[in-house]
């Protein structure tokens, strides 16, 4: 893990944390239980992330765990962050979220997905992978449901093509 021994937080893990804390809160709330503790745990992470997104939409890939400042913007794990923000929006309706997701998604679509590359979940390197596209697909679906903007259908279609390009079919006969 590239962050071992350092007080750094990466976008993949922060995004997953927001996503799963929000998911648990939603499930608890839907089943008559109190999910507010999970929502409260996600909120400070969301606030740090929203403060670290550049004007062009780039999402920080590593944050300083003590100060909350972005250490680098190299793109790793941005999809996981967008997925987390989408789940948090589904939980809270926080009006700050959708414009940020839109700006960031436009950035990563034009810089990465439309160029048929995606940096994802590996914590030990910055490399192109297949896993990193899934949260973009999930977020595109959510954004289409929220906005009815057809561009998110195109984003989802391109994400699906990218993922399918990793499938290797072996026929030994």
Feature locations, PLM:
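Glycan-recognition and catalytic cores of secretory/periplasmic carbohydrate-active enzymes
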Residues: 1-173
């Amino acid at each position: 893990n590239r962050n071992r021994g350092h007080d750094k937080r990466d976008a993949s893990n922060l995004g997953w944390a927001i996503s799963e804390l929000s998911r648990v809160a939603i499930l608890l709330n839907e089943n008559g239980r109190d999910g507010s503790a999970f929502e409260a745990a996600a909120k400070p992470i969301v606030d740090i992330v929203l403060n670290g997104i550049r004007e062009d939409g780039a999402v920080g890939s590593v944050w300083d765990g003590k100060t909350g400042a972005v250490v680098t913007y190299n793109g790793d794990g941005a999809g996981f962050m967008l997925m987390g923000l989408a789940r948090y929006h589904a939980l809270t309706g926080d009006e700050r979220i959708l414009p940020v997701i839109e700006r960031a998604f436009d950035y990563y679509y034009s810089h990465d997905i439309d160029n048929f590359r995606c940096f994802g979940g590996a914590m030990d390197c910055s490399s192109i992978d297949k896993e990193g596209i899934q949260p973009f697909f999930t977020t595109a679906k959510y954004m289409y449901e929220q906005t009815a903007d057809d561009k998110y259908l195109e984003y989802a279609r391109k994400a699906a093509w990218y993922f399918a390009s990793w499938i290797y079919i072996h026929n030994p006969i």
